């Protein structure tokens, strides 16, 4: 009598490279985002005067502006308390993301997304601590309408947030 082994009796094989990733890998990626963000901010701060704008294309300028608030200058004129509020919020969010990275190491897209958010949050926290505001320098526009200036950290946060939505939609679709 031939021995048959049912599929359920065999140990599950893991052929998933994502399982081998570690939180340190994702944190290193976040650190790369921070380094790129801070590098470009330092270059802009050293070569531009406040408010200076240099055209790059017909829809993009490099500028040097400061944001004491959050996205779209939310609470920028709130009197100063917002610097420490957003600094504290960035630190809390960063700590939460590190915890998430330890809990979900096998979820590559999720970890990639939150690593981008972590790097962006840390980049902007550094600005708030060092300068008292966030340094923004990317200015996209169409005719006379200018999108609020932003930076590499903001790009990372935005792309990370979009990827989190994509990851969640993929997860919901599977179930």
Swiss-Prot record:
Q: How does it sit in the membrane?
A: Multi-pass membrane protein
User: What GO CC terms are in its UniProt record?
Assistant: plasma membrane
Q: What's its EC?
A: 3.4.23.36
Q: What class of enzyme is it?
A: hydrolase
Q: Where in the cell is it found?
A: Cell inner membrane
* Keyword field: Aspartyl protease, Cell inner membrane, Cell membrane, Hydrolase, Membrane, Protease, Transmembrane, Transmembrane helix
**MF terms per GO, please?**
aspartic-type endopeptidase activity
Instruction: List the catalytic activities from the record.
Output: Release of signal peptides from bacterial membrane prolipoproteins. Hydrolyzes -Xaa-Yaa-Zaa-|-(S,diacylglyceryl)Cys-, in which Xaa is hydrophobic (preferably Leu), and Yaa (Ala or Ser) and Zaa (Gly or Ala) have small, neutral side chains
Question: Which GO biological-process labels does this protein carry?
Answer: proteolysis
**Would the keyword Membrane turn up in this protein's UniProt record?**
yes
> Catalytic site residues?
136, 154
Q: In which pathway does it act?
A: Protein modification; lipoprotein biosynthesis (signal peptide cleavage)
Spans traversing the lipid bilayer: 25-45, 56-76, 81-101, 110-130, 146-166
Q: What does this protein do?
A: This protein specifically catalyzes the removal of signal peptides from prolipoproteins.
The record's annotation in PANTHER family points to: LIPOPROTEIN SIGNAL PEPTIDASE
Which family does the record claim for this protein?
A: Belongs to the peptidase A8 family.
Name this protein carries in UniProt: Lipoprotein signal peptidase
């Amino acid at each position: 009598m031939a021995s048959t082994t049912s599929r359920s009796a065999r140990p599950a094989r893991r052929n998933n490279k994502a399982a081998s990733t570690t939180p340190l890998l994702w944190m290193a990626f976040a650190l790369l985002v921070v380094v790129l963000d801070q590098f470009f901010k330092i270059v802009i701060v050293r070569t531009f005067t406040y408010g200076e704008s240099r055209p790059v294309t017909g829809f993009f300028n490099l500028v040097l502006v400061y944001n004491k608030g959050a996205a779209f200058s939310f609470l920028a004129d709130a009197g100063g308390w917002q610097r420490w509020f957003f600094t504290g919020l960035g630190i809390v969010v960063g700590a939460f993301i590190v915890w998430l990275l330890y809990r979900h190491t096998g979820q590559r897209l999720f970890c990639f997304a939150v690593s981008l958010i972590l790097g962006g949050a840390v980049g902007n926290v550094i600005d708030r601590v060092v300068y008292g505001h966030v340094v923004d320098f990317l200015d996209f526009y169409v005719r006379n309408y200018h999108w609020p200036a932003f930076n590499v950290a903001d790009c990372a946060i935005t792309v990370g947030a979009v990827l989190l939505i994509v990851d969640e939609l993929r997860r919901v679709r599977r179930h």
